[in-house]
From Swiss-Prot:
Signal peptide segment: 1-18
Keywords: Cell outer membrane, Lipid-binding, Lipoprotein, Membrane, Palmitate, Signal
Subunit structure: Homodimer.
Protein name, UniProt field: Outer membrane lipoprotein Blc
Amino acid sequence: MRLLPLVAAATAAFLVVACSSPTPPRGVTVVNNFDAKRYLGTWYEIARFDHRFERGLEKVTATYSLRDDGGLNVINKGYNPDRGMWQQSEGKAYFTGAPTRAALKVSFFGPFYGGYNVIALDREYRHALVCGPDRDYLWILSRTPTISDEVKQEMLAVATREGFDVSKFIWVQQPGS
């Protein structure tokens, strides 16, 4: 029975470390000259690597707005066809350094933060490639529910160059896709 507190403490320590890495993966370059105000608004999730907190969701969007404390509000929303209902989670994000560098930490659960790193972004802020704290988390985002094949190939090329396995992408069902 004395083992249970030790296992609980080790698990808690692991979760704090695993969920608190706000840095990009080693060797991944984030966008510089980032303008958070231009990034605000709604983005459609075009593709993602599979993970439990979005598993099975379609019509996924992420909406960003400014917080009074200088951070960003984050509202992620997706439709769960198995349950026939919308699911939504609200979080907050803060820059890990200069606000002109697109490296943020984001939290949807209390004091636990993970990395949110914009690694590709077109000049018009229409398409973005975002990764988490390691190469297991990657998203293609767009201001519209669909993207051209040219944009898709550009994003796949950047992801491959940055060391991501693009065969892991799940292409999200969006209106018109």
